[in-house]
């Protein structure tokens, strides 16, 4: 798979932040890109095959726009802007099922007098004083957001791409506009498949700066392993919204500690066993072919590791064959790539400070829950709180957190 990550490193928001901070737009964008790349590295996210920046594709963008003008799909305005003629593309709305007029909902339309129609969108924006700009056949200016993505994609992949990803909030108008631009120019289907991920909520509320509930990846990685974050995020369908609750990441970490413990035991018990179990591949492939059903793939892990525990107790080397295959296959999701001993040592250091009394109460409460003695369980939860600890339950265990 050739995977490209697009950086639209010149747009209205970057220019606005440049004016607010006094940092030149190109330097501000470079600083943000460096921050993104650094936190992705810390989260053990694989690098893309291609890193695409709009500012490194200005020539491609200008050529793309000129092609649209030549084909009758775009027009230059007297003020130096260039607009896409939405009426020239009858298939507009094919992805979202929405109309061109919908793009005007709640939007302040600028330069109406320069457009044929209010819903036409900018491909090139004439330079304003103090803005970053490039020379073009229509005067100095900069590209619009939508054309940046279309032109970069075409430069990297040609006229068609297999899979295009992005947030659900980008379906309209951004991805709709990408389709219109690209298919108007080439006459070919732009993308074969679209994978739109859901939005992030925190305790049921949309995550936003205004609500003060924003979570930064760097801050989460100070508390949890990258495996735990991936496990939590992959536990639901990517198309659905994900609700980050107080117990989401602690529960994921608790599962991973159990899994890594069994991997560590299997590797120490059978150091020379290199075989694998093909059934894991079959089930994993079936899950991925079901619209990247990572939730199903992760749910299989509980059964696999239950079997590993049973086999270890029976001193059966098949335990190692299963963990070998789990590590190889689930590495495709970024999981189980860490050294088990190092992972457990890091987590163990956090657990080492938990007093014996607290651990004993937690174990007693866990036993009460298994016996469905809910009154006793609630009583012991309150006792843990009085000792300074919160307990986060999961299907297979619990995790303790200092209050």
What are these regions (language model features)?
Residues 1, 37, 59-267:
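Alpha-helical recognition segments enriched in aromatics with Gly/Pro capping
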Residues 1-46, 393-400:
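N-terminal, positively charged nucleic-acid-binding surface of large information/translation enzymes
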Residues 4-11, 33-36, 46-61, 79-86:
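Short, glycine/charge-rich beta-strand/loop segments that flank catalytic centers
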Residues 26-29, 33, 150, 281, ...:
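Hydrophobic face of alpha-helices
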Residues 56, 144-148, 292, 296-299:
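Aromatic- and histidine-enriched alpha-helix N-cap/loop-to-helix transition segments
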């Amino acid at each position: 798979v050739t995977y490209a990550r697009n950086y639209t490193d010149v747009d209205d928001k970057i220019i606005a932040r440049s004016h607010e901070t006094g940092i030149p737009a190109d330097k501000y964008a470079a600083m943000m890109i460096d921050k993104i790349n650094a936190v992705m590295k810390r989260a053990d996210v694989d690098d893309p095959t291609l890193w695409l920046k709009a500012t490194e594709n200005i020539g491609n963008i200008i050529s793309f726009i000129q092609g649209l003008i030549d084909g009758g799909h775009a027009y230059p305005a007297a003020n130096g802007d260039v607009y896409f003629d939405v009426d020239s593309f009858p298939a507009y709305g094919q992805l979202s099922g929405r109309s061109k007029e919908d793009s005007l909902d709640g939007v302040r339309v600028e330069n109406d007098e320069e457009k044929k129609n209010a819903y036409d969108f900018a491909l090139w924006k004439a330079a304003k004083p103090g803005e970053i700009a490039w020379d073009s056949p229509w005067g100095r200016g900069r590209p619009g957001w939508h054309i940046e993505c279309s032109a970069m994609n075409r430069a990297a992949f040609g006229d068609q791409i297999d899979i295009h990803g992005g947030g659900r909030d980008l379906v309209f108008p951004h991805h709709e506009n990408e389709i219109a631009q690209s298919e108007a120019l080439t006459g070919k289907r732009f993308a074969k498949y679209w994978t739109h991920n859901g939005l992030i909520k925190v305790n049921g509320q949309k995550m936003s700066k205004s609500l003060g509930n924003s979570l930064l990846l760097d801050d989460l990685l100070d508390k949890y392993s990258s495996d735990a974050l991936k496990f939590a995020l992959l536990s639901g369908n990517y198309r659905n919204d994900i609700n980050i609750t107080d117990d989401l990441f602690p529960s994921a970490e608790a599962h991973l500690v159990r899994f890594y413990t069994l991997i560590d035991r299997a590797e120490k018990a059978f150091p020379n066993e290199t075989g694998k179990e093909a059934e894991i591949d079959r089930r994993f492939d079936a899950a991925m072919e079901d619209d990247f059903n990572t939730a199903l793939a992760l749910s299989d892990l509980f059964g696999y590791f239950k079997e590993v525990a049973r086999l270890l107790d029976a001193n059966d080397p098949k335990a190692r064959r299963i963990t070998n295959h789990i590590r190889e296959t689930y590495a495709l999701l970024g999981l189980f790539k860490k050294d088990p001993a190092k992972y457990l040592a890091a987590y163990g250091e956090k657990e080492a400070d938990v007093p014996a009394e607290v651990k004993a109460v937690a174990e007693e409460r866990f036993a009460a829950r298994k016996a469905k003695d809910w009154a006793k369980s609630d009583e012991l939860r309150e006792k843990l709180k009085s000792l300074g600890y919160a307990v986060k339950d999961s299907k297979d265990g619990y995790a303790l957190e200092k209050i």
